[in-house]
């Protein structure tokens, strides 16, 4: 499969066969804990605007950007909500985006709800300026760099930071595969694991009944160690 298709769908393939995307990685307890801790901690720190006069620095609470950065960037989010999403986007995708809302005179009056990084395409124009494109509720939006707040993470290039999901896809994929295999073992495993052997020839119905009995009485972690009673010359062969 073309890797570009995976990226367009917000996921990347791995050698383990697992598909890595935001939802699958956050399904890993360790990854969730790390992202939640870092994003929540950083977002809880107040983002201030300062004014320097005569070498002294004071909080510029009367500055128009103070309310946007410190209190509430938009009508739907507090500063904590906004910056928590931004930080989580940086940790997972290496980029965070938000539309800059301006008044007619060009003054910044708000920052839009952060844009999901997978939806954003960045390209450089012949003029050297950056152009951003994304889809919002079915509406295609193209904006210049003066209309987009773009925070880049570690690595990458001017078009964007290095995606953690892409860089660590093999490790994430392996962790997902191990978790899936463990779950399958607990769900389908038979304790003890082996073969049910008999000298008689079983009919189709008898085989079905035997399989259903094994699944009902002995499959799964909850039935581990349960004693098995056999009759009619049946024998359990441990594997």
PLM region spans:
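Structured, contiguous alpha/beta core segments that scaffold functional sites
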Residues: 1-239
């Amino acid at each position: 499969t073309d890797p570009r298709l995976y990226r367009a769908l917000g996921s990347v393939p791995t050698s383990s066969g697992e598909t890595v995307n935001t939802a699958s990685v956050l399904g890993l307890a360790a990854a969730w804990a790390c992202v939640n801790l870092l994003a929540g901690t950083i977002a809880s720190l107040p983002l201030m605007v300062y004014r320097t006069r005569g070498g002294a620095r004071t909080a510029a609470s009367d500055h128009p950007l103070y309310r946007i950065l410190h209190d509430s960037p938009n009508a739907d989010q507090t500063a904590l909500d906004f910056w928590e999403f931004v930080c989580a986007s940086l940790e997972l995708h290496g980029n965070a985006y938000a539309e800059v809302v301006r008044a007619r005179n060009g003054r910044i009056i708000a920052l839009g709800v952060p844009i999901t990084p997978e939806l954003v395409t960045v390209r450089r124009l012949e003029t050297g300026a950056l152009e951003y494109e994304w889809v919002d509720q079915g509406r295609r939006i193209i904006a210049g760099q003066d209309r987009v707040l773009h925070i880049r993470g570690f690595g990458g290039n001017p078009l964007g930071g290095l995606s953690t999901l892409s860089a660590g896809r093999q490790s994430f994929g392996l962790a997902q595969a191990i978790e899936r295999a463990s779950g399958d073992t607990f769900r389908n495993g038979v304790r003890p694991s082996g073969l049910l052997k008999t000298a008689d020839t079983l009919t189709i119905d008898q085989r079905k009944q035997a399989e259903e009995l094994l699944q009902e009485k002995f499959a799964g972690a909850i039935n581990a160690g349960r004693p098995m009673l056999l009759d009619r010359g049946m024998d359990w062969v441990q594997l």
